[in-house]
Amino acid sequence: MSNEYFDPKLKIFSLNSNRELAEEIAKEVGIELGKSSVTHFSDGEIQINIEESIRGCHVYVIQSTSNPVNQNLMELLIMIDALKRASAATINIVMPYYGYARQDRKARSREPITAKLVANLIETAGATRMITLDMHAPQIQGFFDIPIDHLNAVRLLSNYFSERHLGDDLVVVSPDHGGVTRARKMADRLKAPIAIIDKRRPRPNVAEVMNIVGNVEGKVCIIIDDIIDTAGTITLAAKALREAGATKVYACCSHPVLSGPAMKRIEDSPIEKLIVTNSIALPEEKWIDKMEQLSVAPLLGEAIVRVHENASVSSLFE
């Protein structure tokens, strides 16, 4: 894309979570970002001002609900309300990273299902569509009664590795049983077998690698996950793979949350290179030499144009 897009009824706005990605997306579509401001009152309350007319327009709001999660979520809800009251024709949320997605079910008694609560808030505020990327639990789509376009970064990540010509002895590794479908999609693209890390998690954010299902001896392994948070799972998996005879271990993910001890764990691990997307804006202190970032702007920009033109987006899911 990247050519100028001639439709005054298409507007793209950015909030504060990932302005750089929003600018890339707008450039891919071929329009300027809409004019708006996010400020705070003296008591910390959020104030949003839309600085141009959006009456009758089809508006796309770019906002990940990453850290600070609650601040970014409230910005989004207030923006949706402002757009609704300003008579936008449609309000389309482009949320590269859907926060609270890991709270998608009751794992213990008296727990909330916060992923559902967030869906309710977004919908009640007035959103008419959601475009998102690699939700931790795809069934969260069912929490919404508005259309959801759930994209994935497998093609983007697979292309990175296929262009590196890592040899014929590739194995794609899922760090847990829940990620097997994702690993299979990448393996099919790379024409490689898969392996699975069988692990048990004794408590939140603590992972213990138990066993490797599949042959990794003498292989170059690529671990693929949706989220890397404290990096306990991914680094223990890399260590287990090397101990099982893997010659090299690469890792990739859609959403680099990278909290707490993540950076030190990755730096000290046998991971050769960690490939992430820019679904979450990373501060400078979260960058190390092992990391490389790929942009999801072309994917999201293409999705916006297709939705706006009432064209099919199904090929973007593959």
Swiss-Prot record:
Q: Which Gene3D superfamilies match?
A: 3.40.50.2020
* Main subcellular location of this protein, as a coarse class: cytoplasm
Q: Name one GO biological process term.
A: purine nucleotide biosynthetic process
EC number from the UniProt entry: 2.7.6.1
Highest taxon of source = Bacteria
EC class of the enzyme, as a word? transferase
Q: Where is the active site?
A: K199
Its cellular-component GO annotations read: cytoplasm; ribose phosphate diphosphokinase complex
Where is Mg(2+) 1 bound in this sequence?
H136
Cross-referenced CDD domains, in alphabetical order?
Answer: PRTases_typeI
Q: Spell out the reaction equation it catalyses.
A: D-ribose 5-phosphate + ATP = 5-phospho-alpha-D-ribose 1-diphosphate + AMP + H(+)
Which Pfam family is an annotated match for this chain, by its short name? Pribosyltran_N
- GO molecular function of the protein, one example? ribose phosphate diphosphokinase activity
Residues annotated for ATP binding in this entry:
D43, G44, E45, R102, Q103
Q: Where in the cell is it found?
A: Cytoplasm
Q: How is the cofactor bound?
A: Binds 2 Mg(2+) ions per subunit.
Q: Which SUPFAM superfamilies match?
A: PRTase-like
- UniProt xrefs under SMART domains: Pribosyltran_N
Q: Which cofactor does it need?
A: Mg(2+)
In UniProt terms, what function does this protein have? Involved in the biosynthesis of the central metabolite phospho-alpha-D-ribosyl-1-pyrophosphate (PRPP) via the transfer of pyrophosphoryl group from ATP to 1-hydroxyl of ribose-5-phosphate (Rib-5-P).
Cited HAMAP family? RibP_PPkinase_B
- Please describe the quaternary structure of this protein: Homohexamer.
What family, per the record? Answer: Belongs to the ribose-phosphate pyrophosphokinase family. Class I subfamily.
What is the protein's name according to its record? Answer: Ribose-phosphate pyrophosphokinase
- List the source organism: Listeria welshimeri
GN (gene name): prs
